[in-house]
């Protein structure tokens, strides 16, 4: 808590609060719905004998390690307020990163065309944010059948072949398989 207050004092409200909000929302996106505020279903009497319902209700903060071993479909949920917070933070970031160039008169057009390094960085961040927002997620493809290129082994030094060819000594079958 002290660290958060120190960061707030160092960076100020305008910079720190949107990033804190984004971090909190992003951290809560990966939490299953039974850990993110939904009442524990273990207290509800189990009328069905479904194993998945028992597994679902058995997990809470004291048994987070069981989540890894459970074979069930994950129930990740994003509620309205998380979506609203994400939209708000993205809107704030896009306005904060947009170049602050006012409408210039004809005389100031030449000065406005000279881009400062801070504006280049802001434009790069804005382009990255736009790319993240418009990127269509594609699940990774699994390549299962790959054939390795079979290269003939060309070893120059094979003592068995040398003995068979030069000395006439043969060890093993007469025909190669």
Curated annotation (Swiss-Prot):
Q: What is this protein called?
A: Secretion monitor
Described purpose of this protein according to its UniProt entry: Regulates secA expression by translational coupling of the secM secA operon. Translational pausing at a specific Pro residue 5 residues before the end of the protein may allow disruption of a mRNA repressor helix that normally suppresses secA translation initiation.
What are the UniProt keywords, alphabetically? Cytoplasm, Periplasm, Signal
Task: Identify the HAMAP family for this entry.
Answer: SecM
Task: Write out the similarity annotation.
Answer: Belongs to the SecM family.
GO CC, any one term: cytosol
Which domain of life does this protein belong to? Bacteria
Q: List the molecular function annotations (GO) for this entry.
A: translation regulator activity
Predominant localisation class: cytoplasm
Q: Does this UniProt record's set of keywords contain Transit peptide?
A: no
UniProt xrefs under InterPro entries: SecM (IPR009502)
Q: Which residues form the signal peptide?
A: 1-30
What compartments host this protein?
Answer: Cytoplasm, Cytosol; Periplasm
Protein's organism: Yersinia enterocolitica serotype O:8 / biotype 1B (strain NCTC 13174 / 8081)
